Every structure is written in structure tokens, then in C-alpha cells.
A protein has these predicted regions:
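Membrane-proximal alpha-helical anchors
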Residues: 1-98, 351
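Surface-exposed acidic, glycine-flexible loop patches that form ligand/cofactor-binding
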Residues: 62, 127-128, 244
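Positions within the helices of HEAT/ARM-like alpha-solenoid repeats
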Residues: 9-16, 34, 66-68, 85, ...
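Tandem repeat scaffolds
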Residues: 131-369
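Short boundary motifs at domain starts and secondary-structure transition points
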Residues: 45, 126-127
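Hydrophobic core/packing positions within alpha-helical solenoid repeats
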Residues: 75, 93, 115, 119-122
Length: 369
């Protein structure tokens, strides 16, 4: 290859290298420009959100209801647009509710619309952005509200909330998520809790008289000394629930599941216990008051009936309807069965009877008379 040809090739290579370098530099410049534009847009958006947040919070302090409502809904929109600000806004709305619902509404008045709106926003929020936020509505007066009902088919999310002493009488909470929520000493009289999830919730000394808990999930819930008289607990899932000294008198527990539940000292007098599963409630029914209860078809497999009604009446099972009840493995040691009607129970053995107290008035199944 002659010298001229070599010079030509070198020139081509140099030109190509310069072109590549130029393209690379242009690309770097373009990328830097894009990054800068992106940062500027982010800063602009952040500034806009800050301005929107400031305006919304300012509206919460307005005298007019419609302005305050606008502030609540503006905060909801910011919460949706900026997950980073989610927990801050949730805390603002919770504080707003506690401040504006610290006292009961005037007689004949409902919970204010702005408080109800803030409650709905919190109850229907995307809890995956909660971070360390925990809903705190202690002692708030929220009776009669329809939490989350403004959003069709979206149940309220109140899991792990602190609702101690909250006034929720007549509140509609159907299908709400209240897992591990603290409702101790709360007022839930006549509340609608149909199909609500209350597993591991704390309901210690909670007033649930007349509440609807049909098909509710109360697995391992804590209901010590809870007021449940006249409550609708049909088909409720109460496996492992703790109900010592709870008042269940006159309640309807038909077809409920009370496997391994603790009912020590509970008052179930006059309750409908048809088809209830008491399997393995070995420490459960001890000392409970079943006077006048209907246990037709109930499963008492392995349940401890040895001290049922002892603290309440001298003849524990008189008046208790046991038609078709399954007593397989039930502990009847020293149980007072005098005057009891056991003629239609299932799986009762002579060994169980020999450990209990009976008399001439005790009616036994055929074959055990």
C-alpha cells in the first residue's frame, strides 16, 4: 500500500472517531438536558403539591362547611397523587376528626359532614402507603356514620386502628376490615357489623348490645366482660375467642363456631345456641350461665360442662334445650344434671353420667335410662 493510500485511510479513521465522539458528546448533553428537565419538573410538581397542601389545610379552618369539605377532598387527591405525603395527610385528617368530634353532636343532629367526609377518606385510603401511620380516633363521637359507604363495594379499612372509647352507636360498618383493632370500651350498640373482620381485635368491655354481627369473623378476638346481650351473632366465626364474663344473654349464636373459645363465667342465659360448635371448649364453658339457652343440635364435643351455671342457679341445666346436642367427650364430672332433659342428646355415655349428678327427674336417652 502506497503512502497516499495510507494517509487516506488514516484520515477516514480520524474522521470516524471524531464523528463517534461527537455523537457521544451530543448524547451526553441530551441526557443531561433530559435529567435537568426531569428534575425541574419534579421540583415544580413538589412545589405545586406543597402549595395545594397549604391551601387545603388552610381550608380546613374555614367557617363555611363547603370550604372545609373542599379542603378534605383536596387532601384526599394529594394523598392519591403523592404517596410520599400519604401518612402526613392521614395524620392531619385523623387529628381533624378527633378535634371536631370530641363532643357529641347537638341533640337531633348528625355527625358533621366534614367529619364524615374525613372519616370516609381515611377508611377508604390505600393502606399500602401507610408506612408507620396508625389511625387514632380514640373517644371520637362518630355514632350513626356510614363509614366507607360512599364508595360502592369498597369496605372500610380500619385494621390495627386505635378506637378505644370511640362512640360508634348505630354505625354501619358492614364488611369492614377491623383486624387487630383496639375497640376496648367503645360504644357499638346497634351497630351494623355484618360480615366484618374482627379477628384478634380487642373488644374488652365494649358495649355491643343489639349489634348485628351476622357472619362476622371474631377469631381469637378479646371480648372479656363485653356487653353482647341481644346481639345477632348467627354464623359468626368465633374460634378461639376470649369471652370470660361476657354478657351474651338473649343473643342469637345459631350455627356459630365457638371451637376452643373461652366462655368462663359468660352469661348465655336465654341465648339461641342451635347448631353452635363448642368442640374442644375444654376451658371454655366452665362456669357459664346457660339458663334457658337453646342448644338444639349444638356440638359440645370435648366441652367442659362440669361447672355450667353453678354460680348462677342450683339446677344448672334445667330449662336448657339440648335436643340433638352432641355430648361426645364432654366433661360432665360433678355436673349437676338434676331435672335436666337429656332425652334427645347424642353420644352421651354411661361413664359420663356416672361422673355427674342426676336424680329421678333427669330425663335420659333411650338405652341409658
Amino acid at each position: 500500500m502506497d503512502w497516499a493510500r495510507r494517509v487516506e485511510l488514516v484520515s477516514v479513521l480520524v474522521a470516524s472517531a471524531v464523528a463517534v465522539a461527537g455523537l457521544w458528546y451530543s448524547n451526553v448533553q441530551a441526557q443531561q438536558a433530559l435529567d435537568q428537565a426531569r428534575q425541574e419538573r419534579a421540583l415544580t410538581k413538589e412545589g405545586q403539591i406543597t402549595d395545594r397542601y397549604t391551601a387545603a389545610v388552610s381550608n380546613l379552618g374555614a367557617d363555611k362547611m363547603d370550604v372545609r369539605l373542599g379542603g378534605v377532598y383536596a387532601l384526599e387527591r394529594i394523598m392519591q397523587d403523592s404517596p410520599r405525603d400519604h401518612s402526613t395527610i392521614a395524620n392531619v385528617l385523623a387529628t381533624y376528626i378527633r378535634l371536631h368530634a370530641a363532643r357529641p353532636p347537638a341533640q337531633g343532629q348528625d355527625v358533621p359532614a366534614d367529619v364524615n367526609a374525613a372519616l370516609t377518606v381515611l377508611a377508604t385510603r390505600d393502606s399500602s402507603h401507610d408506612g408507620d401511620f396508625r389511625l387514632d380516633l380514640r373517644s371520637a363521637w362518630l355514632s350513626g356514620t356510614e363509614i366507607g359507604r360512599q364508595v360502592p363495594y369498597q369496605p372500610a379499612v380500619l385494621a390495627q386502628a386505635d378506637l378505644r372509647g370511640t362512640h360508634l352507636r348505630g354505625t354501619k360498618l358492614g364488611s369492614a376490615d377491623l383486624r387487630a383493632t383496639n375497640l376496648s370500651n367503645a360504644d357499638l350498640r346497634n351497630a351494623d357489623l355484618t360480615s366484618t373482620t374482627l379477628s384478634r381485635a380487642s373488644l374488652v368491655k365494649t358495649d355491643l348490645r343489639g349489634a348485628k354481627l351476622f357472619a362476622a369473623d371474631l377469631r381469637h378476638a378479646f371480648l372479656t366482660e363485653a356487653e353482647l346481650s341481644g346481639t345477632d351473632l348467627r354464623s359468626a366465626e368465633m374460634r378461639g375467642a376470649r369471652l370470660p364474663r361476657a354478657d351474651l344473654s338473649g343473643s342469637n349464636l345459631e350455627d356459630g363456631n365457638l371451637r376452643s373459645a373461652d366462655l368462663e363465667g359468660a352469661d348465655m342465659s336465654g341465648s339461641n345456641l342451635k347448631g353452635v360448635d363448642f368442640t374442644s371448649a375444654s376451658a371454655g364453658v366452665s362456669g357459664a350461665n346457660l339458663t334457658g339457652a337453646n342448644l338444639t343440635g349444638a356440638n359440645l364435643n370435648g366441652a367442659d360442662l362440669s361447672t355450667v351455671n353453678k354460680e348462677h342457679h342450683g339446677t344448672p341445666l334445667v330449662g336448657v334445650i339440648l335436643d340433638g346436642a352432641n355430648l361426645e367427650g364432654a366433661n360432665l364430672a360433678d355436673a349437676d344434671l338434676t331435672g335436666a332433659d337429656l332425652s334427645h342428646v347424642k353420644n352421651l355415655t354411661r361413664k359420663q353420667l356416672d361422673s355427674a349428678r342426676t336424680d329421678a327427674e333427669t330425663r335420659l336417652p333411650a338405652g341409658l335410662s
